[in-house]
Amino acid sequence: DALAGVGHACGHNLLGTAVAAAACALKADMEATGAAGTIRVYGCPAEEIMSGKIVMNDQGVFNDLDVAITWHPFDRNRVSNDIWQAQDIKNYTFHGLSSHAAKAPEKGRSALDAAELMNVGVNYLREHVPGDVRMHYAYIDNGLPANVVPDIAKTNYFIRSYLRSRTEDASERVDNCARGAALMTDTTVDIELVASCSEMKVNRVLTELYYDAMTQVPTPTYTPEELDFAKQITEEAGLINDGTLFSGLEPLEDEP
C-alpha cells in the first residue's frame, strides 16, 4: 500500500503473490502448447500515494507491451465492468512567517490558518460540483508547536470523478481555494501535482473473455478452521457476520 500504519487494508498484500503464480501458470501452459511470447511481471509501487502505474507508463516502462493484465482483491469472485475514476493527487504547501503566538502574534503569518481556510473553502465547494466528484484531504505537516505561529503547513488532496473533464474542473477550483486562502492570510502556496490519471475505459470484449475464463475455474472452498478464523476477524472488527458465505461467480453487469 505504501501507506503509513495499517493503511486501508484493501488486499494489496495479495497482489504480488497472485500475479507471480499466474505468470508461472501461463508460462507452463505456453511451454505445453508451444506458444511463443514473453511474460513479464511488474511490481507497481506507491499505488495509493502516486498511482505508481501511471508514473511507470509516463516513463515508458510499458511501451513495448502487446497487452497488460491486472487484478485486484475483492470480497467475492467477479469480473469488473466498472469505469474507475479519473484522479488528481496534489500537495499544497503554504508558507507563512513564524512568530511567538503570545508575545508577537501580529508579526506572524500563519500557514496553518491558510491550510484550514482552504479546507473550509473546499468543504463549501462540495455543494457546487457534480455528484460523482470526491475531494479528500489530509494534513501532512502542520508546522510548529501551538505557541508558535506556524510558517509552514502542508495538505494532501485526492480529487476524483468518473470523467477526466470533471476532475480537471474540480481540481482547478480546489487550486483556487488554496490561492484564495493564501491571499486572505498573507501567505503563499506551492501546488504540486503528484500524479494524474484518466478514468479507466471498459473493453467489453476483454471483459467477456475474462468472464468466460473464470467460469472454468473452480471457486474456492474453505475449511471449518478458515471459516472460524474469518468469523473471529469480523467480530474483532465489530462487523456483522451472519454466517453466510458468497460462493460462485458474480454475474457480469450489462452496463458499466
Residues of each region from the PLM?
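Cytochrome P450 catalytic-core helices
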Residues: G16-A21, A25, M56, Y210
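Metal-dependent amide/peptide-bond hydrolase catalytic core
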Residues: L112, E116-P256
